[in-house]
UniProtKB/Swiss-Prot annotation:
<dbReference type="InterPro" id="IPR050618">
    <property type="entry name" value="Ubq-SigPath_Reg"/>
</dbReference>
<keyword id="KW-0963">Cytoplasm</keyword>
<feature type="domain" description="CTLH">
    <location>
        <begin position="78"/>
        <end position="135"/>
    </location>
</feature>
<dbReference type="Pfam" id="PF08513">
    <property type="entry name" value="LisH"/>
</dbReference>
<dbReference type="InterPro" id="IPR006595">
    <property type="entry name" value="CTLH_C"/>
</dbReference>
<dbReference type="GO" id="GO:0005634">
    <property type="term" value="C:nucleus"/>
</dbReference>
<comment type="similarity">
    <text>Belongs to the GID8 family.</text>
</comment>
<dbReference type="GO" id="GO:0005737">
    <property type="term" value="C:cytoplasm"/>
</dbReference>
<dbReference type="InterPro" id="IPR006594">
    <property type="entry name" value="LisH"/>
</dbReference>
<comment type="subunit">
    <text>Interacts with RANBPM.</text>
</comment>
<dbReference type="Pfam" id="PF10607">
    <property type="entry name" value="CTLH"/>
</dbReference>
<dbReference type="InterPro" id="IPR013144">
    <property type="entry name" value="CRA_dom"/>
</dbReference>
<dbReference type="InterPro" id="IPR024964">
    <property type="entry name" value="CTLH/CRA"/>
</dbReference>
<feature type="domain" description="LisH">
    <location>
        <begin position="40"/>
        <end position="72"/>
    </location>
</feature>
<protein>
    <recommendedName>
        <fullName>Protein GID8 homolog</fullName>
    </recommendedName>
</protein>
Amino acid sequence: MSLFRIFINQLEEDDEDMATSKKMITREEWEKKLNAVKLRKEDMNTLVMNFLVTEGYVEAAEKFQRESGTKPEIDLATITDRMAVKKAVQNGNVEDAIEKVNDLNPEILDTNPELFFHLQQQRLIELIRQGKTEEALEFAQEELAPRGEENQAFLEELEKTVALLVFDDASTCPVKELLDLSHRLKTASEVNAAILTSQSHEKDPKLPSLLKMLIWAQTQLDEKAVYPHINDLSTGKLEDPSE
């Protein structure tokens, strides 16, 4: 049970005494409680390794494994392959990315039609970005239109994408965000998550979820007490309410 949850439970038991005011918790009291919480170093190391593996920091993961003795949940060699796929999408080399995914595991795209459509859609976007209008139209008709006939959501996405061809100036197009690099990143993240899932690994690192839980717990405790906060998650520094 987290420190915040312990405090919340304790404060709920003292509701009668807190009818008119919040409980004041000094920095000294708070730090004493923090220091009393026992965290295993092995658990912290596992959390760090999970983040490095999921986010694809293979060199950092290898170094951390040597220094801490923490074993990764998957073969680190697969991280390099996964990052190669992600980088290919981020660079607009979608066809290369698809080949790499199939080399890793053909079932990933065979069993995930939505992901495959999004990759093909990204290929179409890249053709439009390069000004290859005829090639883009041919690709849309041969590769994407048949999928749109089978899936209404795919058809709507295809229509939005083809709309990019109507405007000479992409900046005036209602769906210009498809040409943003952020759309490449979105597709790359989707592929990354699918590969992780195929390897029986969480698609998201645990650390961000724990930080969200921290924010939630602080919000819950705010209703019952005044205490030192962690306002900047990047530093983890405790700040008194008066600061």
